[in-house]
Amino acid sequence: MSSVLITGASKGIGRAIAIELAGRGHRVVATARRPETLADLPVDQRLQLDVTDQDSVDRAVKEAGEIDVLVSNAGATVRAPLETVPLTEVEKLFQLNTFGALRVVQGVLPAMRERGSGRLVFVSSIQGRLVLPIITPYGASKWALEAIAEGLALEAGHFGVKVSIVQPGAVATNGAAAANSFFTDDDPYLPLYRQLGALRGDVVTAEDVAVVVADTIEQPEPPLRVPAGAPAERALAARKQASDAMPYMPVPLNW
């Protein structure tokens, strides 16, 4: 069994991954910005880790000990039109979703490289391969994350470190409700914002995604990109078949 460090394990997908991996007998190191939120998880170790804070990352990596697998899951969402989204919010989003992931990778990768083995698993999104309006800042952070992950596959793969990107579609967590939204009452983009529900399509559970992550970790030769569930598979297949001559939308917009 592997020793697995999970970021953002306090709720949603991260929490489900911790429970699934612990149930399969792996040594699980669950981390979150507020470690008290991890108290009831059936894991081996619970650590404070803020992926946006270098000292916090360094401390957690040291306390965790030898790590075979990193599951990079910590993330958040911002909803706003690109015309008016506060750039400070976009910067914060990238610090968490993108740079935070790389920060933790830089903490665990040297030991993996020296051992000649290890796994880096990134929880991304179908929005790392296609663009949705209003949630574009989130998608941009995931596009960047996937570029980093693919680069790591080319670089660290030479030393025996395997990289995978798990891509869920819409997931039944409170992530959407918790997203920071920036709209005024007379915002000209409100009609588009109100159509976002139609873009969600079929929804999978956090537990569904956790099973995909665990199965990926346990595969001897995992693929680079792993759609999490049939809805994600359909969405990504449709995007792949679509022309690049025009912006792609999975459903027609009427606003």
Positions of the model-derived regions?
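The beta1-alpha1 cofactor-binding region of Rossmann-like NAD(H)/NADP(H)-dependent oxidoreductases
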Residues: 49-59, 87-88
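Conserved glycine-rich cofactor-binding loop
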Residues: 10-11
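Substrate-binding pocket helix/loop in short-chain dehydrogenase/reductase
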Residues: 81-82, 89-91
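SDR active-site lid
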Residues: 158-223
